[in-house]
């Protein structure tokens, strides 16, 4: 019986400010209009695993679906087996687990004199008919922040012969994410990211990851 878990790790470096929204339900008067999501313990920005998973799946659907899927449950088999499928007749647990990504270079940012791990960007929308301005404040995790990225991939008898194919899809997803954006307001310059120090490690069972590491660093 084959059973192993592979940890795929990397550093997510922000090349521009990142906005992934948090709750503003209890915002005080004069507070930021759109805060970022933060770790409730440290009050430091995080990148939710759900944001990474959703964005990567959306981008990969443009490549691996033969036609436009109205819902994720209509995705191709290769995406369904990696990300899961909740449709009753096609229900399938995904092979991937996306972890929340936490800030990893706080000390480096502190040494540069950074006073806050977020910034506030002031934006304005103008009503084209009345010319009335609608100013707003958007919070962003600052450029050059790095976050620990971790992805778990499960190998069983069912998918032992599909591992390399799956990892090529994962590699494509990361490349597409670098060429697109993460979070909101990407068309206005937010959310440009880079994945650095890519590495696959066997964390349970026995599986030789040499070929997988070669795939991860190969040009797409």
Curated annotation (Swiss-Prot):
Outcome recorded upon mutating residue 123 to A: Wild-type degradation of target ssRNA by the Csm complex
Pfam families: RAMPs
Impact noted for substituting residue 100 to A: Nearly wild-type degradation of target ssRNA by the Csm complex, crRNA is shorter, Csm complex is altered
UniProt keywords, alphabetically: Antiviral defense, Endonuclease, Hydrolase, Nuclease, RNA-binding
Keyword flag Transmembrane: no
CC cofactor note: Endonucleolytic cleavage of target ssRNA by the Csm complex requires a divalent metal ion; Mg(2+) has the best activity in vitro, but Mn(2+), Ca(2+), Zn(2+), Ni(2+), and Co(2+) also support cleavage.
Cofactors, names only: a metal cation
Transmembrane domains' residue ranges: none
Example of a GO MF term: RNA binding
Description of activity control: Target ssRNase is inhibited by EDTA.
Known EC number: 3.1.-.-
Effect of substituting residue 119 to A: Wild-type degradation of target ssRNA by the Csm complex
Domain of life: Bacteria
Biological process annotations from GO: defense response to virus
Keyword Heme among UniProt keywords: no
Family: Belongs to the CRISPR-associated Csm3 family.
Subunit field text: Part of the Csm effector complex that includes at least Cas10(1), Csm2(3), Csm3(5), Csm4(1), Csm5(1) and mature crRNA. The Csm complex is elongated and slightly twisted with a maximal length of 215 Angstroms and a diameter of 75-80 Angstroms. It has been modeled to have a central protein filamant of Csm3 subunits along which the dsRNA helix of paired crRNA and target RNA binds. The filament is capped at one end by Cas10 and Csm4 and at the other end by Csm5; ssDNA is thought to bind to the N-terminal HD domain of Cas10.
Protein role: CRISPR (clustered regularly interspaced short palindromic repeat) is an adaptive immune system that provides protection against mobile genetic elements (viruses, transposable elements and conjugative plasmids). CRISPR clusters contain spacers, sequences complementary to antecedent mobile elements, and target invading nucleic acids. CRISPR clusters are transcribed and processed into CRISPR RNA (crRNA).
Miscellaneous information on this protein: Encoded in a type III-A CRISPR locus.
Protein name: CRISPR system Cms endoribonuclease Csm3
Gene: csm3
